[in-house]
Amino acid sequence: MEWKIFIESFAGSGSIGLEAISRGAKRAYFVELDRNSYQILLKNCRAVDMEKCQTVQGNTFVQTPLFIDFLKNSKDEIVLYVDPPFDYRDGMEDIYEKSFTMIKNIDVDNIYMIIVEHVSTLEMPEVLGRFSLNKTKKFGKSALSYYFYTQE
């Protein structure tokens, strides 16, 4: 993780991005919509290293592409962590499809890896835009799928 930029979408408390900072990530960007979770995220960032945290309260599908666009000319490699909520609430039934579309629309060369956390029963696409599935690790009811940039 050393010297990489980390973006955590659907950040919640920010635990994954903050762990990336503790392992040497240069900076972490967090997107969280829920007001209560966002307040916890801010508190956690202050406790770790606020200088390395950039937070935004807002819609992941709007804010994450803005972060990616902002960082497109960075020489640093980016790791994008996408963790849509498992519990489907009204209006969120298509959360995975929207997440896949967001990933498919990424058109920058400096994203090193995309990690998608998901329910383990979900069959993940082999290809999402410019990114190919490398492996999936299952942990009970959840799983992590790792996508890497595919050179054209």
Residue ranges and their predicted role:
Residues M1-E152:
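Class I S-adenosyl-L-methionine-dependent methyltransferase catalytic core
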